[in-house]
A protein has these predicted regions:
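Extreme N-terminal starter segment of soluble prokaryotic enzymes
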Residues: 1-4
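Short acidic, Gly/Ser-rich segments with clustered Asp/Glu that frequently serve as metal-coordination loops
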Residues: 10-16
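Active-site alpha/beta core segments
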Residues: 29-103
Length: 103
């Protein structure tokens, strides 16, 4: 049995987000194309999302990018949503991480 775990394909980690990674949007689309072609070969497909409710000192206006970060993936914001190019229709379950602590 094989499972596929897809990690944090969220707006804040894609271009235009508060903690963007170059190529994030293209990766979201590539994952969707992969799922369309190969998703049926996995017994389970799940995803995680960084989802901060109260991250404490994890967020900073002057982050060091080691122990503190700019605000990102705040629960209930557009940045915390999955990127629109990531088709979640094959995702069985989403696991939220980082609610009250760094993920």
């Amino acid at each position: 049995m094989r499972a596929l775990v897809i990690v944090d394909v969220q707006n804040d980690f894609c271009e235009g987000g508060s903690l963007a990674v170059e190529g994030g949007a293209a990766t979201a689309g590539a994952i969707s194309r992969f799922l369309a072609a190969e998703g049926g070969s996995y017994a389970h497909v799940v995803a995680s999302r960084d989802y901060h409710v109260d991250p404490g000192a994890h967020f900073s206006d002057q982050p060091d990018f080691s122990t503190s970060w700019p605000p990102h993936c705040v629960a209930g914001t557009a940045g915390a949503e999955f990127h629109p190019d990531f088709d979640t229709s094959r995702v069985e379950m989403v696991f939220s991480t980082g609610a009250h602590a760094p993920a």
